[in-house]
């Protein structure tokens, strides 16, 4: 592994441990040349995914882009970073195990929205407003109506 500080290839792993859900290995490393310490993460990649954009262009799937878009949707929301990481891992696993190496951006967006709907309603609406390209207030009303309908269908919690 190349040192991000001095570009030396002479680094040593000091500590390795799985994350809480065991989907990632976290490694603490030290550069032998400059003593710089850094962390790397190792994930299983089942297949190389390609995203087919709305304009037909093909680009490699970027997990970090998914993380950034979720962080924007979840900004100032009471959601722990660990939950976000678990959700991202679940989304990527779902995409990789789908059997197709080429995935449309629409499919990715729908999967993300399904996961966000379960995690945080506000983040779901924020993501939907960008993903579905909302132009008017009625677009928001429609999504809020969907969420309200789901809330009515769920049994209410009785508090004593």
Curated annotation (Swiss-Prot):
The keyword Transcription regulation applies. Keywords: ATP-binding, DNA-binding, Metal-binding, Nucleotide-binding, Repressor, Transcription, Transcription regulation, Zinc, Zinc-finger. Its cofactor is Zn(2+). Residues 49-139 form the ATP-cone domain. Residues 1-20 are annotated as: Disordered. GO terms for molecular function: ATP binding; DNA binding; zinc ion binding. Binds 1 zinc ion. A zinc finger (unnamed) spans 3-34. Negatively regulates transcription of bacterial ribonucleotide reductase nrd genes and operons by binding to NrdR-boxes. This is Transcriptional repressor NrdR. It comes from Rhodopseudomonas palustris (strain HaA2). The lineage of its organism: Bacteria, Pseudomonadati, Pseudomonadota, Alphaproteobacteria, Hyphomicrobiales. The gene is nrdR.
């Amino acid at each position: 592994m190349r040192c991000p500080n001095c570009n030396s290839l002479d680094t040593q792993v000091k500590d390795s441990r799985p994350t809480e859900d065991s989907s990632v290995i976290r490694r603490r490393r030290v550069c032998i040349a400059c003593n710089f310490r850094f962390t790397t993460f190792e994930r299983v990649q089942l297949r190389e995914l390609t995203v087919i954009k709305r304009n037909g262009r093909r680009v490699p799937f970027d997990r970090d882009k998914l993380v950034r878009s979720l962080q924007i949707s979840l900004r100032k929301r009471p959601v722990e970073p660990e939950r976000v990481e678990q959700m991202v891992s679940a989304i990527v696993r779902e995409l990789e195990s789908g059997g197709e190496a080429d995935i449309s951006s629409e499919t990715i967006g729908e999967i993300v929205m399904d996961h966000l709907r379960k995690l945080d309603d506000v983040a779901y609406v924020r993501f939907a407003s960008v993903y579905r390209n909302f132009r008017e207030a009625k677009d928001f009303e429609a999504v809020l109506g969907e969420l309200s309908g789901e809330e009515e269908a769920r049994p209410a919690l009785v508090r004593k």
